[in-house]
């Protein structure tokens, strides 16, 4: 039996998450764990990086993991590693400074091959007994300014689980991937994709709920695809993802090709880049279930093998916050519902 969290989970947008985390790291006593796709010393994240280094220097167990995508995006080839770049130089400096202070820095994945294969897309942070996860915020300037959020949970058991997950991911060999798993916690079911190609606890759970739901609220960076995309589109009051012109070349190509293949269209009309990922399912009896986290609900990510994390919850307090986020930061300026066709 799990104890309830010390406080109700709270949804924090990127800038608020960064401020909260930086303050927590500055007063950390025992441990800090951070996993994200990208971690970089940028203008907005510089204070956090300094706090991580200072915490390690005063004896806190600080461990940071990020995907090599941090510095290879746009600079890697299919056969060779990343070419020299400002981000590569910055990553090397971060590695050196954190290790020099007594912390650990682990770069995940390979620099060569397909850019979307085998990525670590998981986002989680732990400071002592507080956890931030189940959202999509990366630790660089674009990450904290996107339309996105993280959930803050004061729960020692959850913090222990996420700390262990961070360490397990960091300990894996480059080609090693753990199986998908589901952990029961007071906040709900924690769905973990270990990155094995074709295996996703998150996609499977979302598909199962979508098939049972009467209606679905959708928000994601990308156009939903595969059987989940079809089930969501049938039940959603429109789909909410970026238009291709809002994205960088690789992401724009993925969005455009997904739209062409599925016929789905987006109602999102705001200019800021949408990076949040959530589904809220309303059952025929009125019960609501949400899945929120790092997964974009795209079948290709499952096929390629991507590490992800999400929360499945029935907590009305959490779901209300997700729906309010959607109303205030996603729905504003929307076009009329239209999910299929030209």
Regions found by a protein language model. Give the residues of each.
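Charged, low-complexity intrinsically disordered terminal segments
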Residues: 1-342
């Amino acid at each position: 039996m799990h104890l309830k969290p010390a406080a109700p989970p709270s949804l924090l947008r990127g800038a608020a998450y960064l401020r909260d985390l930086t303050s927590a790291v500055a007063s950390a006593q025992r441990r800090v764990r951070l996993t994200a796709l990208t971690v970089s010393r940028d203008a907005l994240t510089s204070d956090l990086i300094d706090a991580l280094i200072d915490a390690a220097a005063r004896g806190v167990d600080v461990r940071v993991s990020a995907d090599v995508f941090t510095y290879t995006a746009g600079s890697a080839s299919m056969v060779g590693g990343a070419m020299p770049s400002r981000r590569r130089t910055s990553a090397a400096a971060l590695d050196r400074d954190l290790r020099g202070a007594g912390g650990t820095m682990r770069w995940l994945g390979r620099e060569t091959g397909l850019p979307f294969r085998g990525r670590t897309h998981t986002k989680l942070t732990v400071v002592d007994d507080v956890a931030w996860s189940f959202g999509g915020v990366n630790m660089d300037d674009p990450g904290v300014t996107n339309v996105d959020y993280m959930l803050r949970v004061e729960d020692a058991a959850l913090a222990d689980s996420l700390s262990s997950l961070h360490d397990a991911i960091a300990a894996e060999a480059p080609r090693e991937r753990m199986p998908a798993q589901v952990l029961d916690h007071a906040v709900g079911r924690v769905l973990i994709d270990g990155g094995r190609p074709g295996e996703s606890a998150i996609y499977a759970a979302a598909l199962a709920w979508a098939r049972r739901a009467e209606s679905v609220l959708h928000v994601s960076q990308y156009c939903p695809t595969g059987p989940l995309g079809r089930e969501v589109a049938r039940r959603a009051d429109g789909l909410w993802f970026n238009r291709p012109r809002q994205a960088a070349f690789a992401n724009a190509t993925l969005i455009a090709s997904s739209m062409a293949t599925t016929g789905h269209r987006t109602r999102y009309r705001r200019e800021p880049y949408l990076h949040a990922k959530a589904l809220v399912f309303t059952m025929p009896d009125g019960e609501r279930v949400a899945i929120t986290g790092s997964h974009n609900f795209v079948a290709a990510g499952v096929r390629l093998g991507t590490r992800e994390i999400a929360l499945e919850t029935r907590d009305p307090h959490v779901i209300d916050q997700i729906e309010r986020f959607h109303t205030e930061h996603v729905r504003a300026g929307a076009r009329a519902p239209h999910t299929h066709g030209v």
